[in-house]
Structure formats: structure tokens, C-alpha cells
A protein has these predicted regions:
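Membrane-embedded alpha-helical bundles that constitute the cytochrome b-like, heme-associated redox core
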Residues: 1-235
Length: 235
């Protein structure tokens, strides 16, 4: 029995490279990732100082103060990186694949096929852009959580440091106290948002690896190289 191959029919497959994430987008991704990990660790220490320095009669060991200071610095780095990341999403030419992903949110068929692919009952649909609808929605919600944790964090900062930048922040964001019903609620919301990140990070890492294994077209390393691969037929 003779079968017709791709060579017989004159069809060949080519691997095409597409720039999916620009250099600055990738850089900001890793900046925010490292800041989030550090903020979670240092935040837990601020809430419950589980390490104590050696006892000293002189006020020269300020472990909690240093930890809080670096926590605040990392928080402002996260705020700056997040603002710049939003700017890149809307205006950077290299972020066009991300903006294109938005329109698939309106397609229920793509939604159904995407969920089916994660449940192993359907093939992953061909998507236009960087994200499928489930990914886009997840990252959008994560952006809202980032906004919440930054606003509550700035409010907590202003209630500790009353001069300089803290005074400016207090004048600009004192309304958060009233909206949340007091500083205790602001702190509670800040902690709840932290737990959202704690849950998200391992799930995100797992799904990135899962997608890379099941669909080896540059999933995991796309945030390193920025390149996504696709097969195209050439007659």
C-alpha cells in the first residue's frame, strides 16, 4: 500500500518565529516576580517577627526596621514596574499580540475549547495574540489584585512614616481608610491580597510548565526569549 507523503503532495511545514513579548515586557515580568516573592517573605516577617537578633544593651540592631525598610523599597519598585507595564500594554508596538488577545474574550467558542483543552477533552483552539481567554482574564484579575495590594500598602506606609513621601502619600490616599472602614481593615485586605499571590504563583508556574510540555511552541521560554513558534504550511 502506497501512502502519499507531504513531499508527494508538495506541501512542507515551516517553523515560523513570532516576537510575542518585547524585551522591556520580559524585564518587567521578572522584576515584578522577584519583588512579589521578596514582599511576601518580608511581609510575613513584619506581621510576625519570627527571627530575633542577639540581645544587646545598645540600640544598634534594628532587624525589624531594616526588614520594613526593604519591604517598602520593594513595594515602590513593584508599583513603578506595574505602572510602566500597563503603559507598555496599551502603547508599545511589541505588545500588540497582548492587545489582540482581548477580542477573544468575546468569542464563547474559543472559551469552550480553551476550557476543554485544560480538561483534556478538546484540542487547544488556534488563538490570535499572546493569551487565550482564560489566561487574559486571570492576568486582568491579578492586575486588579496588584492595584489593591499597592493602594493598601501605600496607605499602611503613610500611617507609619508621616513626613516626606509618607506625608504626600497620606494626603493622597487617606481616603482608603474611610473606604475600608479603618486601618485594621486596610491591613486585613493587604494580607488577603497577599494570599492571592501565594496561591497564584505555584499554580501559574505549574500551568506554564504544563503548557510547555503539552504544546511545545515556546511556552515557558517565551518570557525569556520573547519568541513563540508556529507551524505554517507552504505549498
Amino acid at each position: 500500500m502506497v501512502t502519499r507523503t507531504e513531499i508527494d503532495t508538495g506541501i512542507a511545514k515551516e517553523i515560523q518565529q513570532h516576537l510575542e513579548f518585547g524585551a522591556m515586557t520580559r524585564f518587567l515580568h521578572w522584576v515584578r516576580a522577584f519583588m512579589i516573592v521578596f514582599l511576601v517573605a518580608s511581609g510575613f516577617y513584619i506581621a510576625y517577627p519570627f527571627l530575633q537578633p542577639d540581645a544587646s544593651g545598645e540600640p544598634v540592631i534594628f532587624l525589624q526596621a531594616y526588614n520594613r525598610a526593604f519591604h517598602c523599597i520593594a513595594g515602590f519598585v513593584l508599583i513603578a514596574a506595574s505602572i510602566f507595564r500597563v503603559y507598555l500594554f496599551f502603547f508599545a508596538p511589541s505588545s500588540k499580540p497582548e492587545r489582540t488577545s482581548f477580542w477573544q474574550l468575546l468569542n464563547p467558542l474559543v472559551w469552550a475549547k480553551t476550557i476543554g483543552a485544560y480538561l483534556f477533552i478538546a484540542k487547544h483552539p488556534h488563538i490570535k495574540g499572546a493569551y487565550n481567554p482564560l489566561q487574559f482574564t486571570t492576568y486582568f484579575v491579578l492586575g486588579l489584585v496588584t492595584l489593591i495590594i499597592c493602594l493598601t500598602g501605600v496607605n499602611l506606609y503613610a500611617n507609619v512614616y508621616h513626613d516626606g513621601l509618607g506625608g504626600i502619600m497620606g494626603a493622597c490616599f487617606s481616603w482608603i481608610d474611610s473606604v475600608c472602614g479603618g486601618l485594621a481593615n486596610v491591613r486585613a485586605i493587604h494580607h488577603i491580597a497577599t494570599w492571592v499571590f501565594i496561591v497564584f504563583v505555584p499554580v501559574h508556574i505549574y500551568l506554564v510548565i504544563w503548557n510547555s510540555v503539552r504544546y511545545p511552541n515556546g511556552g515557558a521560554d517565551a518570557m525569556v526569549s520573547g519568541i513563540r513558534y508556529s507551524e505554517e504550511q507552504r505549498v
